[in-house]
């Protein structure tokens, strides 16, 4: 592979390799097992957020306070994910841009362990993640990571 001509797109499957939580497990844990079956995970998230039965999340007629609490719990659960051999192999690829739907910072942690340091980031967006990225560098090799669904460092960005 030639450097900087390729992009890697990845999601939670990398975390599942090392027995990290998948979305269904995470939502089941957060909702104390009360998720709806046979509906997409996105709707399960909304159901937990809006549920009258999930009293710790539902704080009124709108979802916003409940959703903030839900995002906080998701971020706390995902902050304990550790890297694995797949992340190390991914970080060693001659690729500049990594696009991820993951909220966790596992690739960033892996890069730091490999001697990379953060040289730039843009996380000015408070709600969405269109321009949210971090750049890491080691020996003139740069890696730019885009969290397109938000990240646990900016919990409100989680979508």
Which sequence ranges carry the predicted segments?
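Gly/serine-rich nucleotide phosphate-binding loop at the start of the catalytic core
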Residues: 1-91, 96-99, 107, 117
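Nucleotide-state sensing region of NTPase/ATPase domains
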Residues: 102
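Conserved subregion of the PPM/PP2C metallophosphatase catalytic domain
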Residues: 108-112
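Active-site gating loop/helix substructures
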Residues: 117-159
